[in-house]
Amino acid sequence: MAHRLPTRWDIKWEEELLKLWEKEGRFKTKISGSRPVFVIDTPPPYLSSNRPHIGQTASYAHFDMIARFLRMRGVDVIFPFYLDRNGLPIEVQVEKKYGVVAHEIPREKFIKMCKEELDSYEGEFVSSLRRWGLSFDYWPNGTDSPEYRRMTQKTFIELWHKGLVYEAERPTPWCPRCRTALAEPEIEYREEETYLNYIKFKVKETGEDIIIATTRPELLPATVAVIFHPDDSRYTRLNGMHAVVPPEGQVVPILPHKAANPNFGSGLVMISTFGDTRDLMIVNELKLPIRIIIDEGGRIKTGKYAGVSIREARAKIIEDLKNAGLLVKQERLVHNVPVCWRCKTPLEIIVTRELFIKQIEFKEKLIELAGKMEFKPPEYRQVLIDWIKSLELDWPVSRRRYYATEIPIWWCAKPNGERVPLLPKGGEYYVPWRDEPPPEVKEACKDGRLEGDTRVFDTWFDSSISWMYASGVTKDFNAFSKVYPHSIMRPQGYDIIRTWLYYSLLRAYLLYGDVPFRYVRINGMGLDEKGEAMHKSKGNVIDLLAPVEKYGADPVRFWAAAAGRLGTDYRYNENVIREGKEFLTKVWNISRFVLSFPEPQQKPQLAPVDRALLARLYDVAKKVITAYSEFDVYEPAHALYNFIWHEFADHYIELVKSRAYNREGVFTEEEQRAAIWTLYTAWRYSLKLLAPIMPFVTDKIWREAYGRSIHDEMIEDPPEEWKEGDQALFHLVKKINSAVWRYKNRRGMSLADRLDAVLYVSELAMQAAKDLKYMHKVSDVRPGRGAEQIDDEGLVWLG
């Protein structure tokens, strides 16, 4: 029987479908036991506002399209969504919003403030993503839940017992504002304009002046050496002598070292503890003494300038140098300053006691494992490898903050002064700074006094085991043993390759000796219309729901898929969304047309042009399925848009419309059924291929036609018999159609007007002669050439 779709698509049906999908349980993980299982290690976003911006949402739409495709290929997909609620981002936000300083108020109160702030955002954040039709399984237990933190602590305890964790007092990058150590990937660089100060030092042995240029005069009291390049003939005579450092007068050695650049400043370089990682490297290499002058709050703690901030110390020292005649000159300079990734405060390097995870000794093995993962696109593998090669320090994982997973260590202070770390057996969530130690810890410290560690983990220590959490290790459907690592895919942006991806690789290797997942899908950044990153401070953040309310979710999802190739940045473009809306309308109208005919129950004898269309669809389907399988949604979006609109609708439907209706009875019933059967076959298959990208309109149409959801259908490989058709015939028909349409347009004719002429075509095209005749309303269609050529290739003539 025929079906009648409503005249127009109505956006309100999207909300109705969302409720229906929820009722049908489509957002819950289902593991059948008989189908293969695949895990999408969904990036848990930082929760810093009540909604994500549209660029971020577009990437999550990509993940949803992949999940929907895999389900329609017979795969049980674990596609979780939960929030990253740990660490500095929320702490800094709460401090700024409420005007508090974390370490100046009770810890319990600050933690409560952070949790309440997060809770106030989460509901709307999740529901706004759901409005896009994202079919994730929402897990309310985010990274701050006892469930997740228990898993984090358990893996730490495992690493501890493997001898992969140690505590040490050593120089570490430090944020004075956040008052915590940072790891190398958490360091960002910002261009700043400053002064290069040329300062007089004295050579102790000769009394002569030497000039040293520095952008950090506040570190003069921390200077422990002066270096020059071994090949710099200006200074080789100073080797082994000593410099007197102003303004406090400490005496330091003058030494040769290749790190000095003869072409920068005067060629002499002061080494301070610590100006940057270069200083740190040279101090360690040359075994120089350490003079720490900056405290954890970013203030000078010794000497004449004690108690003032770094900025104030810089100004005071410059003033003192000027007054003493020791400041030769100043040059304006733009240089890169290391800053905290979260609050953007310039970093210092100070000596603190931290917990470290071993990583430097495993660099070669990690590079080898990077080659084992499949990167989409492949060029991003090298970005990871280059980062691994650049690492110089072990990973400091302890942080002196509050809203994060607590480090599960109690310290046993022995009567002899020894301080022994004691760890629980694991399996519970431990809060050592607040809770009583477990029995096994008490038992191990009978003769001492127990103190719970007050530190927390780096937030990347939590998120770097997301692949375990996503596999359901804490859930009833634990699929980890089935999927690890061969059936796990990590989708993420290129901006966190050196953090989330690297640390995930490190953790998997240290825990299991393998990679964390087989596939790595790298997406670009979502940008505004001008190609700029979206930031609240710029005022260019585009709300994810505004275009959905205007156009509907499917057109916006179409933009998300079509906006940029895999691995490249993608711009917000309302014109593409409008194209998506027009495409949706075209799909709706095609469906109304096809469904106006009763669906044939048996396959009839197809005409050559019917088989030609299916041959074309075979190639399109292969391309689309291959791209989806490679986690690419850009190619399917463009291929389906082109085929459905510009080949199936524009050419095939127009070609066989007369045959399908057969109002004049010029076609046989078999010919008519062949047209209708081919229309249904191509329409059904195309609709299923489109469903992952545009799930609302395709599901509504399918339910109207068949009374069930399209998302329960299978996307099978196209039948091999479809290849038997001659695609050349279909492409030739397209050329003939275009030539006749142009001919009519040039003469001001409607495409439906009769053309009192004979259409001359090739022998191949004669296989579609009858359809061409009634489509273009010509007198006849014959082989050969007529009097007037109407195309550029000499394929189409009139006579």
Curated annotation (Swiss-Prot):
Classification via InterPro entries: aa-tRNA-synth_Ia, Anticodon_Ia_Val, M/V/L/I-tRNA-synth_anticd-bd, Rossmann-like_a/b/a_fold, tRNAsynth_Ia_anticodon-bd, Val/Leu/Ile-tRNA-synth_edit, Valyl-tRNA_ligase
Annotated Gene3D superfamilies: HUPs, Isoleucyl-tRNA Synthetase, Domain 1
Gene Ontology MF term list: aminoacyl-tRNA deacylase activity; ATP binding; valine-tRNA ligase activity
Entry keyword annotation includes Aminoacyl-tRNA synthetase: yes
Signal peptide: none
One Pfam family hit: Anticodon_1
Record's keyword terms, sorted: Aminoacyl-tRNA synthetase, ATP-binding, Cytoplasm, Ligase, Nucleotide-binding, Protein biosynthesis
Principal subcellular localization: cytoplasm
Catalytic activities: tRNA(Val) + L-valine + ATP = L-valyl-tRNA(Val) + AMP + diphosphate
Subcellular locations according to the entry: Cytoplasm
GO CC annotations on file: cytosol
One biological process term in Gene Ontology: valyl-tRNA aminoacylation
EC number: 6.1.1.9
Domain of life where this protein originates: Archaea
UniProt binding sites for ATP: K536
Protein function: Catalyzes the attachment of valine to tRNA(Val). As ValRS can inadvertently accommodate and process structurally similar amino acids such as threonine, to avoid such errors, it has a 'posttransfer' editing activity that hydrolyzes mischarged Thr-tRNA(Val) in a tRNA-dependent manner.
Notes on the domains: ValRS has two distinct active sites: one for aminoacylation and one for editing. The misactivated threonine is translocated from the active site to the editing site.
Homology family: Belongs to the class-I aminoacyl-tRNA synthetase family. ValS type 2 subfamily.
Name of this protein: Valine--tRNA ligase
Higher taxonomy: Archaea, Thermoproteota, Thermoprotei, Thermoproteales, Thermoproteaceae
